[in-house]
């Protein structure tokens, strides 16, 4: 068990000044118990905490670090921008055009794009745009999907909201809640029912094409295409929230992997290379409704700042030029097979879901295809498993309902170490 004396001291101090001691709820370890770990440094696939313990990192800053931490090309580019260019001007810069052009080239749905500062900003802006474009009010989301902490999305939400047992949040007005309808993930009939009950009133359907905030839940074959067809028939804007799976499951995201093109796409995490960046983009005729060209207002003081765009642009260029995706697939498949073999040896039948380098081990024997099946997972067993992995230097998300991310810089030795640790941790769940 790692010694966490300094982390414990810092957490006690933080609770005096920061609500719950953290700036994002899942970091407080409420789901798994124990002391939140304060990190001091990241390098490649590893992190070191303030007590000197080192961990193999499968959280990757909650997804952005597909290339690991402190990638030399990204670090060098940031140093150049910081010392030779500046951090922010509040004016247009040439780099904005460069990253926008690149996004239009690599993401199938994007003809125009607007940069923002977070995934939450991207999803909030995309929904507002869809409402303005269609002159309709209601949206359909899916139970357990998480689209940031905007009011419209905190109704049967995933991620930290689900982790803390509060998928619905106080502070969301009844009017807002009434305009958000929830369908069952992977159930097209539940969507059709809502559309028929609200004929002509649905502005958008927003979905994670790979649900990554209820653990990891892949879309069933044909489900995304059925949504695409329904939205086309009904004049509804289809929004793919690719904040997590964008640039992760393929260079062009889940829409490239599955061959289904939405009307709008929201992006975050990897697009910022570890700095706060988001974006939303899509069809030109829809995007042209955004101010100053159109009448749908959206703005941001630090949107498109050179420091954040440097990290994002360099990350995207590396992904485009080096194409790590086949190797990421191999590495993630190695872990999946290793975990399965371990469970077979121990007579266990827990569920593994994986899409590319996003994966989740659910502590349930029920196939996980939606919110209802995800919450059958045994959270106490996950907590035991989590700490048993942590004791062996493997850092996972402190929540059953988050993804495990494989990074391109992980070595075969790292993967073998993880499989061995998994066996020991699975044994611990049987005690």
From Swiss-Prot:
Pathway, per record: Porphyrin-containing compound metabolism; protoporphyrin-IX biosynthesis; 5-aminolevulinate from L-glutamyl-tRNA(Glu): step 2/2; Porphyrin-containing compound metabolism; chlorophyll biosynthesis
Gene3D superfamilies tied to this protein: Aspartate Aminotransferase, domain 1, Type I PLP-dependent aspartate aminotransferase-like (Major domain)
GO cellular component, one term: cytoplasm
Keywords linked to the UniProt accession: Chlorophyll biosynthesis, Cytoplasm, Isomerase, Porphyrin biosynthesis, Pyridoxal phosphate
Reactions mediated catalytically: (S)-4-amino-5-oxopentanoate = 5-aminolevulinate
Oligomer and partners: Homodimer.
Entry-linked InterPro entries: 4pyrrol_synth_GluAld_NH2Trfase, Aminotrans_3, Aminotrans_3_PPA_site, PyrdxlP-dep_Trfase, PyrdxlP-dep_Trfase_major, PyrdxlP-dep_Trfase_small
Cofactor(s) demanded: pyridoxal 5'-phosphate
UniProt enzyme class: isomerase
Record's subcellular location: Cytoplasm
The family this protein is said to belong to: Belongs to the class-III pyridoxal-phosphate-dependent aminotransferase family. HemL subfamily.
One Pfam family here: Aminotran_3
Location, primary (coarse class): cytoplasm
Gene name per UniProt: hemL
CDD domains found in the cross-reference section: OAT_like
Protein name stated in the entry: Glutamate-1-semialdehyde 2,1-aminomutase
N6-(pyridoxal phosphate)lysine: modified positions: 269
Organism: Prosthecochloris aestuarii (strain DSM 271 / SK 413)
